[in-house]
């Protein structure tokens, strides 16, 4: 008997145009094996990762653009075991809407591990700076800068979620999944600067007023 691969439903949410579909399509096997659920208008991408404890899989639910027409149906969230909320660092409104996505996610899925991702850090005109990204600290989420088009930090959200779901901080990915070739390059020095800014911002006390710095 082939051993069943542990599989987790991952709900991917965020405003339209933040790069969710671009992000999930980077994983080539998942893109090749995706399934469309017509009743919900959802594409499910099975993203496999090889870890030091064997293989595991995330069934990533992607909205196929429905969020542009308002909220998502509960069927999208039901049985979600983990989540990624995505915003676009070049668009302040997409960050401002993060609390709405978080609220919808936890209303149905309750206490699941969630990663907040700021996408498009390859774009020079960054609008949402490290010091304004505080929502994850208030809600105990993990945060990563990512760039879907360059594959920058692609694996980070999945590794963090896998460790939480399996309950083992020693879990590592031992082989990289096949990813689509980068369409853009990130500036390594700039990424390091962003990383330092994020670390410095995390050391600061949280602002009292939620929208004071938006």
From Swiss-Prot:
Chief location bin: nucleus
SUPFAM superfamilies linked: P-loop containing nucleoside triphosphate hydrolases
Binding, GTP: 15-22, 65, 119-122, 147-149
Localization terms from the record: Nucleus
GO BP field: protein import into nucleus; ribosomal subunit export from nucleus
GO-annotated molecular function: GTP binding; GTPase activity
Sequence segments annotated as region (Switch-II): 65-81
Organism superkingdom: Eukaryota
Stored Pfam families: Ras
Keywords for the protein's UniProt record, in alphabetical order: GTP-binding, Nucleotide-binding, Nucleus, Protein transport, Transport
Chain spans, region Switch-I: 34-42
GO cellular component: cytoplasm; nucleus
Annotated Small GTPase Ran-type domain residues: 4-168
CDD domains on file: Ran
Record-stated family: Belongs to the small GTPase superfamily. Ran family.
Subunit structure: Found in a nuclear export complex with RanGTP, exportin and pre-miRNA.
Biological function: GTP-binding protein involved in nucleocytoplasmic transport. Required for the import of protein into the nucleus and also for RNA export. Involved in chromatin condensation and control of cell cycle.
UniProt xrefs under PANTHER family: GTP-BINDING NUCLEAR PROTEIN RAN, RAN GTPASE
Official protein name in the record: GTP-binding nuclear protein GSP1/Ran
Originating species: Candida albicans (strain WO-1) (Yeast)
Lineage per the UniProt record: Eukaryota, Fungi, Dikarya, Ascomycota, Saccharomycotina
Gene this protein is translated from: GSP1
């Amino acid at each position: 008997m082939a051993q069943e691969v542990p599989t987790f439903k991952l709900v991917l949410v965020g405003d339209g145009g933040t790069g969710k579909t671009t992000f999930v399509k980077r994983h080539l096997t998942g893109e090749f094996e995706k399934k469309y659920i017509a009743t919900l208008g959802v594409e499910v991408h099975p993203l496999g990762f090889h870890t030091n404890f064997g293989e595991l899989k995330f069934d990533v639910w992607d909205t196929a653009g429905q969020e542009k027409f308002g909220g998502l149906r509960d069927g999208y969230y039901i049985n979600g075991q983990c989540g990624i909320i995505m915003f676009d660092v070049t668009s302040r409104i997409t960050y401002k809407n993060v609390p709405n996505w978080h609220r919808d996610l936890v209303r149905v899925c309750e206490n699941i591990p969630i990663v907040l991702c700021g996408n498009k850090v390859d774009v020079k005109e960054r609008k949402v700076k490290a010091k304004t990204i505080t929502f994850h600290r208030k809600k105990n989420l993990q945060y990563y800068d990512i760039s879907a088009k360059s594959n920058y930090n692609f694996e980070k959200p999945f590794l963090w979620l896998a460790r939480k779901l399996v309950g083992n901080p020693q879990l590592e990915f031992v082989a990289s999944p096949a990813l689509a070739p980068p369409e853009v390059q990130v500036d390594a020095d700039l990424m390091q600067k962003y990383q330092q800014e994020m670390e410095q911002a995390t050391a600061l006390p949280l602002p009292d007023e939620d929208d004071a710095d938006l």
